[in-house]
């Protein structure tokens, strides 16, 4: 029998879900590629869906996540706002701490069950 495990997904909420692993991944990809369109393509997501994810998250959070400019002679691009960088850093640190805590208490909570499997 396989060893028992747990799964933890970290999501932030206001009145609605506003930030989670999908938004974080999208922002990291935009940061690397400097383009929401390229990030959406790499993640095999429609560009319109990527924009909806960003807009919904921005609306729930109350601040912008991206600075963007349309294409043209110099080309367009998208860059994370200072608030987006702070949010990503805080979110990832918080999630890592929660996973560490979960790991530390998992055996205490379920070790007895592990012996029965």
Model region roles, listed by residue range:
Residues 68-93:
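Basic, amphipathic "hinge/linker" alpha-helix immediately C-terminal to the N-terminal HTH DNA-binding motif
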């Amino acid at each position: 029998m396989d060893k028992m495990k747990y799964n933890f997904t970290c999501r932030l909420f206001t009145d609605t879900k506003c930030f989670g692993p999908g938004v974080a991944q999208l922002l990291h990809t935009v940061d690397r590629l400097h383009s929401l369109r390229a990030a959406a393509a790499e993640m095999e997501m429609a560009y319109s869906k990527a924009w909806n994810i960003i807009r919904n998250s921005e609306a729930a959070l109350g601040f912008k996540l991206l600075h963007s400019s349309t294409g043209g002679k110099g080309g367009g691009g998208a860059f994370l706002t200072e608030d987006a960088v702070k949010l990503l850093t805080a979110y990832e640190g918080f999630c890592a701490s929660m996973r560490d805590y979960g790991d530390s208490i998992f055996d205490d909570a379920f070790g007895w069950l592990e012996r029965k499997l």
